[in-house]
A protein has these predicted regions:
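A solvent-exposed interaction/effector surface
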Residues: 1-132
């Protein structure tokens, strides 16, 4: 199993993404899925604003009451801190849920994240970061 497992809404169903290890340089290096519901695709480089939290997550696409509560925590935190990326996180922002631990991990030891997409290139995002 790889970590994180990223879940989010899809077209009519939810999607689950596995981040492949660095040893796989090309899609052709990956094993061919044996289940027709599984597809392999390359996802372009992207920038996300990340909110990390611990606890138990629901099943499915991760967009449940826990994720919604954590989204509001992230929105309040970003709003109170201001900063260069506050315009990208709001109460209606879309997000992905990243889970890092196996199901048997105790909830208080689990690492979860909400990933809010930021429509900037990595270079543009880096330029917006505050300097020390």
């Amino acid at each position: 199993m790889t970590a994180p497992v990223v879940v989010g809404p899809g077209s009519g169903t939810s999607t689950m993404q596995f981040i492949m290890p660095k040893q796989f340089k090309r899609i052709s290096d990956l094993p061919t899925p044996t289940d027709s519901r599984v597809s392999i695709r390359e996802v372009p480089e992207a920038v996300y604003l990340v909110h990390q939290f611990s606890g138990n997550m629901g099943r499915g696409d991760g967009h449940d009451a826990i994720a919604e509560r954590e989204r509001m925590v992230a929105v309040e935190k970003v709003a109170s801190e201001g900063g260069a990326f506050s315009e990208y996180v709001s109460a209606d922002s879309k997000f992905l849920v990243a889970r890092y631990d196996p199901p048997w991990t105790l909830p208080f030891l689990r690492t979860n994240e909400l990933w809010f997409p930021v429509p900037l290139s990595p270079t543009e995002a880096t330029a917006k970061l505050p300097t020390a």
